[in-house]
Amino acid sequence: MSVLAIITYDVKPGRIEDFLTKLKQAADPQFHSPVMPKSVRLYRNTVPGPDTGPVLLLIEYADMAAYGARTAFENGNPTWQALFAAHPNAPETLVSVQLLTEF
């Protein structure tokens, strides 16, 4: 069964390009693992405007085992951890993580 991780971020005003740059860095081959997501998609509000509200990152995995393997890779990679570490100057703030399974 497919697993969908929905990661919600608040992006600071005027910092969306910085956040997109960070996501592009996350796609670098140094972060490729034996198990990779099936798809990665980024959404934002359309109404009342694109710079209002949260940004949603949707990452789809083949199953819970694939999600677990990828999560273990990310948690064990110090460079990945540094890239997404919370700090005051980061363009984004993590709001929530939801993990959904298809049925």
Question: Can you describe what each PLM-predicted range is?
Answer:
Residues 12-14, 62-64, 102:
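Short coil/turn motifs at secondary-structure junctions
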Residues 10-23:
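Short, surface-exposed ligand-recognition loops at beta-strand->loop->(often short) alpha-helix junctions
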Residues 24-40, 48-51, 60-97:
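An amphipathic, aromatic/His-enriched active-site/gating alpha helix that lines ligand/cofactor pockets
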Residues 7-10, 26, 45:
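A structural feature that tracks compact, well-ordered secondary-structure segments
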Residues 44-46, 101:
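Short, low-complexity Ser/Thr-rich regulatory SLiMs
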Residues 2-10, 56:
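Active-site-flanking beta-strand signature of metal-NTP-handling nucleotidyl enzymes
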Residues 69, 102-103:
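A beta-strand edge to alpha-helix "cap/lid" segment located at domain peripheries
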